[in-house]
Curated annotation (Swiss-Prot):
Name under which the protein is recorded: Nucleoid-associated protein SSA_0326
UniProt keyword Magnesium present: no
Main localisation: cytoplasm
Function: Binds to DNA and alters its conformation. May be involved in regulation of gene expression, nucleoid organization and DNA protection.
Compositionally biased spans, kind Low complexity: 1-15
Length: 99
């Protein structure tokens, strides 16, 4: 069994690696798209919206519901990518905990 000092060193090392992973994710930009790429949302890995771009074909003052649905679709697509990337990058640390 590991002694306490060794466990603490390993935990500190893992914490630094996790912080680095979180910073890398935050600096990464993810792009989500609606059907036919009519709405494109760009978010950072820490889930901050960078931009939302609309194809003029989807902007119809008489049909704002479709624009709203496509915007939500694009945002959810980007958020799913962020969640997947986070799980891949940060999930690896769960098995490395010394306790």
């Amino acid at each position: 069994m590991m002694n306490m000092q060794s466990m603490m060193k390993q935990a500190q090392k893992l914490q630094k690696q996790m912080e680095k992973g979180q910073a890398e994710l935050a600096a990464t930009e993810f792009t989500g798209k609606s059907a036919q790429d009519l709405v494109v949302a760009k978010l950072t890995g820490d889930k901050k919206v960078v931009s939302i771009d609309f194809n003029p074909a989807v902007v119809d003052p008489e049909d704002l519901e479709t624009l709203s649905e496509m915007t939500a679709q694009a945002l959810n697509h980007a958020l799913a990518q962020i969640d997947d990337a986070t799980q891949k990058k940060m999930g690896a640390f769960a098995g490395k905990l010394p306790f």
